[in-house]
């Protein structure tokens, strides 16, 4: 059972976010600073022990945010788990390789790029000064971040060093750096050359353009019910779509899945629950998120409900960390379409448990779940062999 305070504490309004400009060693490099680093779910890979974190609870993945002025660059670095960039505002040039050549691809609002582990990557703001990307990192323990040799050299030239135990030593702030300290050894050119090379054509398969999303109006059991009408578009991994022909453009393991959900004005997603933890980021519109405190069975009436309103606009995007296995529903509280990004823990397919009254109402509309957990015509499903 959840308390009202527990439920409310998981709401992350955009205006509550706090950043640091000194999360990483590149803060001292002029072309890389300022860079505003946010940690929403988990600490991410920040090398600053004072990094503000909105919610430290483990989810199986981590959610962060990044913003920096036009023309600023995040230099070459590498991760050991998935890193997903979700562009919510502006235009960005994504870079990868540094092996030694650099490949680039531009992304815009609503686009998602997932960069494979064990390759160097960076990015540059080529749009508005307040451009913003959310980020998803695979796993609770990511293994940290490994900077490219050129990044460590540029920082050292500014008097800022990274020790082999990942402590930042800033001589400009009066900290001492001497021969007794051991600097982090970067990869050698030979080691970098041994990393996999991803061509622009290969990386393009890992960019999911917002304009090319595969929306389905049959992805949820309740979609055809009066006052519902939600559509779902998969991005990566096995999500909660109940459309049997849905397949995400990116299918390899990340530790989480990503989908978009679109609610028409006045629409909703009816009462349901998932076994997995899920993070919702409101991209556009006003969405009421209703969460129940009691973990009752599907036949029970709704229990005590906490209602939160999440808003998404070019000025900011509210988030909510949905607890596992709790009853919830989503309602479009605005007079325009609402868009929400869903990040759900786990590589396995997610299975929705619908409230009993939703299942009955769907049956009246000749909709039911087949033996494989997909939406189909009830009059056929009822004829299936026991």
PLM ranges: what are they?
Residues 122-196, 327-386:
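Double-stranded beta-helix
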Residues 98-116, 293-324:
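Short acidic-glycine-tyrosine-enriched beta hairpin
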Residues 73-75, 93, 100, 112-113, ...:
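Histidine-centered metal-chelating micro-motifs
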Residues 263, 269, 281-284, 288-311, ...:
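Long compositionally biased, domain-poor regions of proteins
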Residues 44-51, 62-79, 257-275, 293-296, ...:
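Conserved short histidine dyad/triad with adjacent acidic residue
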Residues 51-56, 74-79, 96, 104-105, ...:
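Short histidine-centered beta-strand/loop micro-motifs
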Residues 70, 80-98, 265, 275-297:
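Glycine- and acidic-residue-biased ligand/ion/polar-headgroup-sensing regions
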Residues 1-59, 163-254, 374-386:
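A short, N-terminal "cap"/entry segment at the start of jelly-roll beta-barrel domains
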């Amino acid at each position: 059972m959840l308390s009202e305070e527990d439920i409310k504490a998981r709401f992350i309004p955009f205006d509550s976010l706090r950043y640091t400009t000194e999360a990483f060693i590149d803060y001292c490099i002029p072309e890389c600073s300022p860079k505003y680093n946010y940690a929403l779910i988990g600490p991410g890979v920040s090398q600053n022990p004072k990094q503000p974190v909105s919610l430290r609870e483990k989810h199986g993945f981590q959610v962060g945010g990044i913003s920096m002025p036009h023309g600023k660059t995040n230099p070459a670095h590498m991760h050991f788990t998935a890193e997903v960039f979700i562009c919510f505002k502006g235009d960005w040039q994504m870079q990868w390789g540094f092996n030694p050549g650099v490949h680039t691809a531009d992304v815009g609002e609503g686009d998602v790029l997932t960069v494979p582990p064990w390759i160097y990557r960076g990015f540059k703001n080529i749009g508005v000064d307040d451009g913003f990307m959310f980020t998803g990192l695979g796993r609770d323990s990511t293994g940290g971040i490994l900077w490219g040799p050129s990044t460590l050299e540029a920082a050292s030239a500014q008097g800022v060093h990274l020790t082999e135990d990942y402590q930042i030593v800033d001589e400009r702030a009066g900290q001492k750096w001497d021969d007794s300290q051991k600097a982090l050894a970067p990869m050698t050119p030979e080691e970098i050359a041994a990393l996999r090379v991803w061509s622009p054509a290969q990386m393009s398969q890992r960019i999911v353009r917002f304009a090319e999303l595969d929306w389905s109006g049959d992805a949820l059991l309740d979609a055809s019910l009066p006052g519902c009408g939600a559509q779902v578009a998969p991005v990566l991994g096995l999500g909660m779509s109940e459309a049997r022909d849905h397949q995400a453009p990116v299918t390899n393991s990340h530790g989480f899945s990503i989908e978009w959900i679109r609610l028409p004005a006045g629409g909703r997603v009816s009462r349901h629950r998932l076994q997995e933890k899920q993070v919702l980021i409101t991209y556009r519109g006003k969405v009421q998120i209703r969460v129940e405190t009691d973990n009752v069975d599907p036949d029970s009436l709704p229990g005590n409900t906490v209602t939160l309103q999440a808003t998404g606009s070019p000025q900011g995007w509210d988030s909510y960390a949905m607890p596992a296995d709790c009853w919830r529903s989503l309602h479009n509280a605005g007079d325009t379409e609402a868009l929400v990004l869903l990040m759900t823990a786990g590589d396995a397919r997610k299975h929705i448990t619908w409230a009993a009254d939703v299942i009955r109402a769907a049956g009246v509309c000749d909709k039911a779940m087949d033996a494989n957990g997909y939406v189909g015509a009830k009059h056929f499903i009822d004829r299936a062999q026991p």
